[in-house]
Amino acid sequence: MNKLSITATFICTVLLGSAVALPSHAGELRVTWKEPTSFTDVRPSNESRARFRERTLEALEAHLVELAASLPKSHTLSMVVTNIDLAGQVWPSQFIGFGNNMGTDVRVIQRVDIPRMTFSYSLTDSSGKVLKSEDDFQLKDMGFMDTNIR
């Protein structure tokens, strides 16, 4: 997996208002989802928002654990995710020519609707020394439709 693909996978990282400590086989990953209900776009198309957040979070946690496995054993990556904007926009199906007035929605994804994520992070070693950190890091994947992440 190339660096762009790994970076793009972080864009999916969303939802839940509490800190989650995810131990891995190598380093440690700590993620805090700061006010996920105020994220720009974590809107479901055809399910409740709460269930969508729960389902999305479960998938993202599993993927983050995979990524954390590449950290050196003595390192800890701490992230505070402050915003998520998923690719595309959710529209009522009748607005785009699908379905009828049954209340279903559809997420329409076009090349210009790129996924974005804003977060702060800190990578520390076993002594607590900060190896790398950044505040309000803005990640976006303009080529998300051209790559196969999984």
List the predicted regions and their residue ranges.
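Outer-membrane beta-barrel proteins
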Residues: 42, 88-91, 144-148
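Surface-exposed short loop/turn segments
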Residues: 81-126
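A short, structured loop/turn motif at beta-sheet edges
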Residues: 69-77, 122-133
